C-alpha cells in the first residue's frame, strides 16, 4: 500500500515516511515513536538518546487543513522547521499522525560524508539504485487537486 493509501485508511492528518536506521546513527535524525498500529505517539528531532531508530525521511503527507493551520500558527517562529516545530505542534493538537515504513532506496544526504557516500554509490559499477531502470517510477509529477486521491508516488 502506498503512504497515500495508508493516510486515507487511518484517517491520518499527517503521514511520515520513515525508515529504520542503525541505532548508532539514530541521533542524527528526527525519530518517530509509534504504537503497534503505526500511530505516532511522539516525535523527537535529533535526540541525544533516541527512544527509536525509526527515522523520518523528511517526506510527509498532510491534509491541507492541518498543514495550513500549523503553518499559520508557526509563521512567527524564526527558522520554523517541520521536525522541530510543525510535527510536534500537530501532536500537541491531538492530530492523528501515522508512520509509513518505507523499504525502498533512500539515502540520507544531511552531512557532507553521507552526501559523498551517496554519490559514490551512484557511480559504482553496479549501483544499488539505477535511475534509468526506475525512470518512469521516479519522475512522476505530484499535483494538488482539491478532494483528490494520490494514486502513484515514490
Feature locations, PLM:
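Conserved beta-loop-beta/alpha segment of the NTase-like Rossmann-fold superfamily
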Residues: 1-36, 61, 69-73
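Short coil/turn connectors at secondary-structure junctions
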Residues: 9-14, 56, 94-95
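A generic structural signal for well-ordered coil/turn residues at beta-strand boundaries
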Residues: 28, 55-56, 103, 150
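Short, surface-exposed amphipathic charged segments that create phosphate/polyanion-binding patches used
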Residues: 29-33, 58, 113-117
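A short, charged helix-loop
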Residues: 35-55
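Left-handed beta-helix
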Residues: 39, 64-154
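A conserved catalytic-core signature of glycosyltransferases
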Residues: 56-57, 62
Amino acid at each position: 500500500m502506498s503512504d497515500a493509501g495508508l493516510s486515507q485508511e487511518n484517517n491520518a492528518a499527517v503521514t511520515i515516511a520513515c525508515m529504520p536506521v542503525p541505532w548508532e546513527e539514530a541521533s542524527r535524525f528526527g525519530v518517530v515513536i509509534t504504537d503497534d498500529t503505526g500511530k505516532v505517539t511522539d516525535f523527537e528531532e535529533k535526540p541525544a538518546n533516541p527512544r527509536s531508530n525509526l527515522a523520518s525521511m523528511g517526506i510527509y503527507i498532510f491534509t491541507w487543513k492541518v498543514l495550513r493551520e500549523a503553518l499559520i500558527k508557526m509563521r512567527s517562529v524564526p527558522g520554523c522547521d517541520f521536525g522541530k516545530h510543525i510535527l510536534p505542534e500537530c501532536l500537541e493538537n491531538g492530530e492523528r499522525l501515522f508512520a509509513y515504513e518505507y523499504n525502498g532506496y533512500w539515502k540520507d544526504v544531511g552531512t557532507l560524508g553521507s552526501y559523498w557516500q551517496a554519490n559514490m554509490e551512484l557511480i559504482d559499477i553496479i549501483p544499488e539504485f539505477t535511475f534509468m531502470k526506475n525512470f518512469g517510477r521516479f519522475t512522476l509529477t505530484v499535483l494538488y487537486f482539491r478532494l483528490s486521491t494520490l494514486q502513484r508516488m515514490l
